């Protein structure tokens, strides 16, 4: 994301996102592993808290069809602009962006209609003064998106309607989300952990 005076643009081609894309770290990264990517399997994913769209773009660049849901009209407009410019950039950027479908609305309602295989949820967390969350872009994002007081309800809806798994992106040392069952397993990143909730009843998922 590039800053422009008092505003910003979502940028999937340049900056940190472009660097991450060009590095080609692939399916071995923590998020793709948590989402169920394997050598021969690419899941269909709903990013229920799209935000900056970075995670969705990473997953789309690895071949997944990703539906992004953003309830903030302002953030939705920034995401639409970012996807449009990635399409215009051509090549692998356009290929990844072509797999991204952007919806504006409340994930708690839309998930019931989509019945997704995999849901990724990254709630807005309280700011931590010694992390990148104090950066201007994150402050602006917080102003656009606000807090997520309904994050527990969103998790409950996701667990009720996902067909394979739900992935909760959570601060590494934070307590578990209250009121939600224990995750099936966790994938640990540098500063983040991914709590993975398998939706049992699918024999393939139970073997993963």
UniProtKB/Swiss-Prot annotation:
Pfam families on file: SAM_MT
Entry EC no(s): 2.1.1.242
Localization, UniProt: Cytoplasm
GO molecular function terms noted in the UniProt entry: rRNA (guanine-N2-)-methyltransferase activity
Primary location class: cytoplasm
CDD domains: AdoMet_MTases
Reaction(s) this enzyme catalyzes, per UniProt: guanosine(1516) in 16S rRNA + S-adenosyl-L-methionine = N(2)-methylguanosine(1516) in 16S rRNA + S-adenosyl-L-homocysteine + H(+)
Binding positions (S-adenosyl-L-methionine): 54-55, 70-71, 122
Family: Belongs to the methyltransferase superfamily. RsmJ family.
Protein name in the entry: Ribosomal RNA small subunit methyltransferase J
Organism the protein comes from: Agrobacterium fabrum (strain C58 / ATCC 33970) (Agrobacterium tumefaciens (strain C58))
Gene responsible for this protein: rsmJ
